[in-house]
Amino acid sequence: YFFTTCPNICPSMNNNMKKVYEEFKDEPNFLIVSHTCDPKRDSAAVLKHYADSMGVNTNKWVFLTGRKDSLYNMARVSYGIDDPKNIVANIDDDFLHSQFFALVDKKGNVRGAVYDGLKKKEIEKLTPYLIKIK
């Protein structure tokens, strides 16, 4: 989860993920999915421009937007990258900004642990799982 205008952790996270992308982008079973945490500003067109600026193939790295409540619920419940207790009463007051990545298999199951996208050692922990798709 990131947002295109983030001046803090998002650029570092996405640069780390781009290294993973570069290593595995030619694998047929490899796909990165990044969700915006700011759907009010990050429209599909804005995300497409962002992907283009990163120089990635959007068939291999997908940038998604949607309804804020659905995006945040997915982060907390499906991916486990934010504590469900962080939910606030009004979704408009909620802001999920996390440096964590989840490795999800093609069946939608989170594999392994949740990884800190700011730490090189954490990113390296993804490699054994990704090598299995080769």
Model regions and ranges:
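Short, flexible turn/loop "capping" segments at secondary-structure junctions
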Residues: 26-29, 55, 103-106
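Thiol-based oxidoreductase modules, predominantly thioredoxin-like and allied folds used
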Residues: 28-42, 59-69
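Extracytoplasmic/secreted proteins, especially bacterial periplasmic and envelope-associated proteins
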Residues: 12, 19, 42, 46-49, ...
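Short, internal strand/loop/helix patches
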Residues: 48-98
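Short hydrophobic signal-anchor/transmembrane segments that target glycosyltransferases
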Residues: 16-26
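Extracytoplasmic/periplasmic, Sec-exported soluble proteins
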Residues: 5, 9-12, 39, 63-66, ...
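Thiol-/selenol-based redox modules, centered on thioredoxin-like
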Residues: 87-134
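Short active-site neighborhood of thiol/selenol oxidoreductases, capturing the structured segment around
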Residues: 1-17, 33
